[in-house]
Amino acid sequence: PTLGVLDQRLLYWPIGNGSGIQGKRVVEQWQEAMTAVRLTGGWLAGFIDRPGKRSVLTMLHTLDLDNSGRKISDLYRFDSDIFAGLTDTDLFDTLLQPGERSVVFVDVSQHNNTFAGRDAHNEVCFFYLKTGPGEGHLARVDIPLWVARDKAALGSVHALLVDQCRIIGSYPYVITRADEIAVVGRRDQEELENRIALLLAEQDIHPSATGKQRSKDFARGGKTRFEG
């Protein structure tokens, strides 16, 4: 089977206007694409580098609650105070060794209920993966329920991602390579930037590049294809 790896979460939801007509249609198309992958026999995974969620910590906290009637939404609202800035990354970065993964969890959210309501196989699950030695090399990997329930598929996805991360160090090479291919050529990029600059200048807007963008430009300038 073919594995499709995205550099984002599988539980896609538009920011801001997700409940609008256009937002709902985009989500439906995303879900339809997930179903299409399953029907072709493929696998899906969403790779989130250095995740900042507290899903597992919140779950663990519920086990220590005396008030069983407390709403999950209340836990998420106050989790920053409860955990003093800690995230799931802090937990699993300590527990896992390079190449190891956590058990599989189900994403508990209303958005995930929407996904499962449309196609039960598309309910999003996840696990944490230690992608390299030392601190800071931890990823959250989203997988659909149909992959999570198939032990062979789950094992293969785990092994493939570990193998990909070993090629260039703690990040899947296939995603890096996709970024290389998707990068606009220098001449086209300069033409596009000039047009954007002219439009911004007309509005008396003079933006400066962020540190992140400068680092991406520098890295892309010297990339070469991996020959393994």
Language-model region placement:
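Phosphate-binding glycine-rich loops and their immediate beta-loop-alpha structural context
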Residues: V5
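Long, contiguous domain-sized segments
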Residues: Q8-G228
